[in-house]
Amino acid sequence: MRRNALELEVFAGQEKSELSMIEVARAILELRGRDHEMHFSDLVNEIQNYLGTSNSDIREALPLFYTELNFDGSFISLGDNKWGLRSWYGVDEIDEEIIALEENDDDEVAPKAKKKRVNAFMDGDSDAIDYNADDPEDEDAYEADPALSYDDENPDDEKNEVEAYDAEINEIAPDDLGEDVDLNEDDDEFSDDDAETSEE
């Protein structure tokens, strides 16, 4: 036999079968008051006792109820699956409550060990090369060789690049082209008359 000690005055005169679980949850939390938040399972048990529903009916309704509890703006999760009414807390107070709960969780959690990556395609093949195993960039202590990096602040890098570029140009271009070449800038321009002739 179920205990039905909880009576909610808000629903006096209404058929319990017509009430939604979310309405009953709100009324239960309002009756309990601030500083009496409830764990989800306790809240569900209170709702079940008040409505007098069977275990199978409650189990069937749980996914919808949990979704409504999350999306209904009047409820707030305080961590550890503990629920309260949003109206109990000011905006700043909500952040403080959640942060305090997160800090308590951080104290209890041990640091996780770094996991070694496993290549599923190697299957113990001794001839296979594991390219992930010898990648120096994967190591935390890896530092790039400063001689191989390009530094924007170093003018010697730019000077070396210019000298290398000039050397390449001198290899390609003959030395006697220097001053004898006249560039006719008019030849390089494309006039409107040329455009009309090329289209026809």
Swiss-Prot record:
Gene Ontology MF term list: DNA-directed RNA polymerase activity
Entry annotated with the keyword Nucleotidyltransferase: yes
Residue spans of biased composition, Acidic residues class: 125-143, 150-200
A Pfam entry, by short name: HARE-HTH
Domain HTH HARE-type span(s) in chain numbering: 19-88
GO process annotations (BP): DNA-templated transcription; regulation of DNA-templated transcription
Keywords for the protein's UniProt record, in alphabetical order: DNA-directed RNA polymerase, Nucleotidyltransferase, Transcription, Transferase
GO CC field: DNA-directed RNA polymerase complex
Region annotation (Disordered) ranges: 125-200
Assigned protein family: Belongs to the RpoE family.
Subunit structure, as described in the record: RNAP is composed of a core of 2 alpha, a beta and a beta' subunits. The core is associated with a delta subunit and one of several sigma factors.
Its biological purpose: Participates in both the initiation and recycling phases of transcription. In the presence of the delta subunit, RNAP displays an increased specificity of transcription, a decreased affinity for nucleic acids, and an increased efficiency of RNA synthesis because of enhanced recycling.
HAMAP family listed in its UniProt record: RNApol_bact_RpoE (MF_00357)
Name recorded for this polypeptide: Probable DNA-directed RNA polymerase subunit delta
Gene field: rpoE
